[in-house]
Amino acid sequence: MVQPYHAPPRASFLQKLGPGGAASLGLAALTVLGLAGLPWAYRLRQVLRGVHGDDLAPADAILVLGRRLEADRPTRVFESRLAHAEALWRRGLASRIFIAGGTTGKARLSEAEAGRDWLVARGVPASVLLLESRSQHTLENLFNVRADLRAAGWRTLLMVSDPLHLARARATARGLDLEVRCSPARDAPPARGSLAWLQRAALEAFLLHWYHTGMVYSRIIGSRQQLERVT
């Protein structure tokens, strides 16, 4: 079996791209430009549709996707994700909480460790929390969590992130054959309809298009390493 590429801790943008990443990024940009923005508009519709969904159901574990830290502390966006995961856990929708996210930027803690400390300070027992602290981005979050999930004999995840991120996270999880339901942290900034919100929606639409372009590109060129990374 070909070992998939994983970015090192505190990876640069080019390191995070990995083998084939720059090519698929270029293809994604070219298809958007060459087709007058239609692929981007289609993905934007998916991103905005995902804002409204809340697919609550009991699961084996709740998964909180990480976010880059500021001064070794969760940002408001990450805090909103964590608080929503805590609320779902207290409602009894799952008995364990996965927190995913490695060491990024200048942080001394991983995103998962900072998330654990935040939840423990709010009274969540440390024994409830499982950490995935090796990843550098959403794809690696889910790839590593999949291995941990299988090792524990679990199947279902209730995935938590901010609303604009969930369409891409859901697509990535399904590409990895994960059985996920999604619940958005609706109070996560930026405020809905603000300029920052619109900019984030536009970016997420392109990132979602890039992900799907990468899947198609990997299959066309028959790259086992690329396919092992995304499926």
In which residue ranges do the predicted regions lie?
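C-terminal capping/extension of enzyme domains
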Residues: 194-225
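N-terminal membrane-anchoring alpha-helices
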Residues: 1-60, 221, 226-229
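Secretory/periplasmic and organellar redox-cofactor proteins
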Residues: 178, 229-230
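A structural signal for short, hydrophobic/glycine-enriched beta-strand patches
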Residues: 2-9, 40-201
